[in-house]
Amino acid sequence: MRILQRALTFEDVLMVPRKSSVLPKDVSLKSRLTKNISLNIPFISAAMDTVTEHKTAIAMARLGGIGIVHKNMDIQTQVKEITKVKKSESGVINDPIFIQAHRTLADAKVITDNYKISGVPVVDDKGLLIGILTNRDVRFETDLSKKVGDVMTKMPLVTAHVGISLDEASDLMHKHKIEKLPIVDKDNVLKGLITIKDIQKRIEYPEANKDDFGRLRVGAAIGVGQLDRAEMLVKAGVDALVLDSAHGHSANILHTLEEIKKSLVVDVIVGNVVTKEATSDLISAGADAVKVGIGPGSICTTRIVAGVGMPQVSAIDNCVGVASKFDIPVIADGGIRYSGDVAKALALGASSVMIGSLLAGTEESPGDFMIYQGRQYKSYRGMGSIGAMTKGSSDRYFQEGVASEKLVPEGIEGRVPYRGKVSDMIFQLVGGVRSSMGYQGAKNILELYQNAEFVEITSAGLKESHVHGVDITKEAPNYYG
């Protein structure tokens, strides 16, 4: 029998406090998603069909993190999810949605409803701006067969030229009391759009994670060999692809990664792995970040069904030991129950953590609401569950094309308590990490990694760490017993 190492998880260890002059409110949580993409907070929502679609992704990016849209949908639907995130807000919308004057109000309604916008610029066949259609123009219109050109606000409009700053645009919009400012070139061709909502969101969400065009960042999951899906997602503006597999150290994953890096200009996160060798091979094949974790998730049964995996603390430590030599970020995926677990993962060298169960219970997650014994819950399932595998994740567990009655699941379906908005959950997690960094005297995540010292604790130590000897009469928002 070959025993490679003693393996530990989050509940097996604690960080030792250090002399500190650092206050939690003064620490920086900036980190990296990949070697080329930054994060303002080290949190990622998981690519699971009960966790991340566009609503969760938008909420995460506004707070400074990022969401990874799951792949249990056809390519066009996933592309639409990415587009919704990308068009949800922007400093300057460089490719604005527009409509032509001969279209009907019914056509315009489809566009505004689909993209959740309140109006659209109107252009002619040459792309020249000829008007704008807003809620004010259509508010009292009942005949949706009318032409857009008969109802729109016609030129001349208040416009701005390419290159205007957001501050200048804000002053101009305030002066003329308008909510939308079309951007045109010298020939009056529509080139962009600035909305008052985007300017307000810049103030409301100062830590929002945005790309070079002022759009929210978002990632998307793909499976083995899905180069066509990857290409469509890149065209839609996705910031990073997550090549998602239960076993990231497989020949097909390595081959797919190499093909993507040859044909597309996009950062690729690859996982999941738990060993030094796997990390090294993924980096050699072109991975821009390595995702770590086999079996730590609350809904994952891989370790029991297959007898394979590694406790998460040791897995992170293994992978960081290799990835840090190449300056490749490590993402700790799974096993996060408390903010203290996040702090431990970051102290071990992870650049960010991926969260499923804690976000599955939020308002923005796509899971179904349910009532059980008078309390609100939301559905949550592993991507290795029967339900998720029949919807499209079977390739993640190397069972693509297998009949539903022949699938061997590596996950379960369940429910989690409703936890309010994504922002409420992230607020508590961020607060816990800040507190930990204060105890460690760490001004930033790199210092946390450099400073942290761990002790291994016993089962008695774990029992002492949790609430004991008292009945909880009022639940805390960051402690679940």
Residue ranges and their predicted role:
Residues 1-21, 161, 285, 307-332, ...:
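Alpha/beta catalytic cores of nucleotide-metabolism and tRNA/nucleoside-modifying enzymes
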Residues 23-40, 46-48, 77-115, 122-124, ...:
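Bateman/CBS regulatory modules and CBS-like beta-alpha motifs in cytosolic regions of diverse proteins
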Residues 38-44, 91-96, 211-220, 259-274, ...:
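Short beta-strand/loop segments at the ligand-binding rim of alpha/beta enzyme cores
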Residues 55-58, 228-236, 274-292, 332, ...:
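Catalytic cores of alpha/beta
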Residues 62-77, 238-250, 288-306, 336-369:
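Glycine-rich phosphate-binding active-site loops on the catalytic face of alpha/beta enzymes
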Residues 69-72, 98-99, 119-121, 159-161, ...:
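Catalytic beta/alpha-barrel core
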